[in-house]
Amino acid sequence: MTLWVLGLNHQTAPVDLRERAAFAGDALPRALESLRALPQVSEAALLSTCNRTELYAMADEARSLVNWLETHAPGLSGYLYQHQEAEAVRHLFRVATGLDSMVLGEPQILGQVKDAWAVARAHGALGSGLDRLFQQTFSVAKRARTDTRVGANPVSVASTAVRLAQESFARLNESTVLLIGAGETIELAAKHLSESRVRRLLIANRTLAHAQTLASQHGGYALPLTDLERHLAEADVVFSATAAREPLVTRVQVEQALRARKRKPMLLFDLAVPRDIEASVDELSDAYLYTVDDLERAVEDNRRGRREAADQAEAIIDLQVARYVETLQATTRQAPLKRLRAFGDSTRDELLAKARQQLHNGKPTDEVLEQLAHALTNRLLHPPTAALRDAALNNDLELTTAADRLFPEKPGYQHPPIATPIVRTDDADPAP
């Protein structure tokens, strides 16, 4: 089996394709089950965020993985990147460290990678190969963040959106802000907004208790999602980041809100993939919509400023990839030896137990030893004998050459006799 990663992200695919490729909620366990059902796949994990969807797998080949992704989201094959073995390891290390993120060094991605590992593990999609890789990934990401400043003072998508809101509404302390959702992105936005002392903070979520918790932490007001349309006109700024499969805010709703506001401008940030706000809202006068792709341009300055720390982190990753691959190759080389030793040990134990039972039953010792030696020879030599016979029939020179090296033919060769130890006595002459 080969290690593969296939995926698309904010650099290779537009937001409309990323939202079709995303896995959310109950779709993720079902997708893992579907993947594991493929005969070419032994292990799998899925990482799905607003900026990327990636499939990690131990599989015979990549074509079956591409076909599976195409079935999930037709038309994405032209946007996919694909890595295998060492380059797949490097890619995951870079992703978890934040080096492949829209916001360089952002900390949220490591938690999302851990979530992907936990879900795959909980649903039986991980084996020793991917589990070992993810465990090493967490260690490498932690070291890169500890030994460099790649994660220092991180600028998140949420903080970038809040900064743009501050630039658009010079006095956020006189504005009403509506947050839709209660996940990590909205939590970060709420934190930055409360620090900006917005006049009024509304938080709408499908689970009201989650909205109430967030509202109590940041001095806001919690709303059930069913009240969203009724309160939309009150918002000068809207931030939305949920896992909904369909838009929560429609063009019609925003048009109605603008009329109620007497055309007073609204600023909307859609931080979700799939999108929470209909794209056509941006066509409305007095409505200004930003998506995660728009925010990428806004964070480019931050990316340039963190390049030195990123280069240091890249050097750490290069070293750790080399060490991981070396360890993996050593383990792979040892595997046939371990299987051979285990086969020999189990065969010996089985036949020895049988011989002891025969002795216990009174069978002559010489006869038991003769049968034991004969059985051991047959049992141990049968697999290589059968393999060599097939190799000869199929003209497999590689295997027959290997057999010559394992069992060299030396006419007249005899094993040296077992040396008899020399017993020293007090009367013995000392060695000259």
Curated annotation (Swiss-Prot):
Active site positions: 50
The gene coding this protein: hemA
EC number(s) reported in the record: 1.2.1.70
List of residues binding NADP(+): 181-186
Protein name: Glutamyl-tRNA reductase
Pathway the protein acts in: Porphyrin-containing compound metabolism; protoporphyrin-IX biosynthesis; 5-aminolevulinate from L-glutamyl-tRNA(Glu): step 1/2
Binding site for substrate: 49-52, 101, 106-108, 112
Pfam families named in the record: GlutR_dimer (PF00745), GlutR_N (PF05201), Shikimate_DH (PF01488)
Superkingdom of the organism of origin: Bacteria
GO BP term, example: protoporphyrinogen IX biosynthetic process from glutamate
Catalysed reaction, written as an equation: (S)-4-amino-5-oxopentanoate + tRNA(Glu) + NADP(+) = L-glutamyl-tRNA(Glu) + NADPH + H(+)
Molecular function in Gene Ontology: glutamyl-tRNA reductase activity; NADP binding
Site, Important for activity: residue positions: 91
Native organism taxonomy: Bacteria, Pseudomonadati, Pseudomonadota, Gammaproteobacteria, Lysobacterales
HAMAP family: Glu_tRNA_reductase
